[in-house]
Curated annotation (Swiss-Prot):
Protein name: 7-cyano-7-deazaguanine synthase
Alphabetical list of PANTHER family matching this protein: 7-CYANO-7-DEAZAGUANINE SYNTHASE (PTHR42914:SF1)
CDD domains for this protein: QueC-like (cd01995)
BP-aspect Gene Ontology terms: queuosine biosynthetic process
Annotated InterPro entries: QueC, Rossmann-like_a/b/a_fold
UniProt enzyme class: ligase
Amino acid sequence: MNSTPKAVVIFSGGQDSTTCLFQAIQEFGVENVEVVTFQYGQRHAIELEKAAWIAKDLGVKQTLIDTSVIKAITSNAMMEEHEIKQEGNTPNTFVDGRNALFLLYTAIYAKGQGIRTIFTGVCETDFSGYPDCRDVFVKSMNVTLNLAMDYNFNIRTPLMYLTKKQTWALADKLGAFDYIRQHTHTCYLGVEGGCHTCPSCVLREKGLNEYLSEKTSGQKNV
């Protein structure tokens, strides 16, 4: 088996996972990076279309995994036509078990390919109240997968403690700011270019405006 270090990115075609993809490419080289995309029954096909387009455009191998069986056992606004709202501490866009499932399937795939490093774009700084975006969950899952498969995975979460403003700054540092701004899809409602009103769009645009304001201010002070 090839001993060259490789990485796989859990990839949705959104801002966060695309930022992780650019970081993985910078660290490992584009020829040593793959992406895994999940069809979990999401309401809008645009998410899958964007992911496929970006993977092809950047020249990385994409593997699509169907986990839509989850739709048969849980209900939420990401997969069904429900109004997006907060339910207690967790919004109804939360898909129970999604990130656990994504990490498990990605790890199974990665081991078969001889890959140890897994990138995921989860974040608990500006996170939407999703329990499976927390660092404690990812670290726990890393230990569980290592024990379950007798294999040393390294789950990387480069965005874990970054605000959205800082995530835009990282994209800029990676030379991917314009690409991510133009080509990624984040909108919960599936609107091309964003609806500007759903929680995901609001968070993305708030971080973008904060970063651009800070960048412009910094340039004026030089």
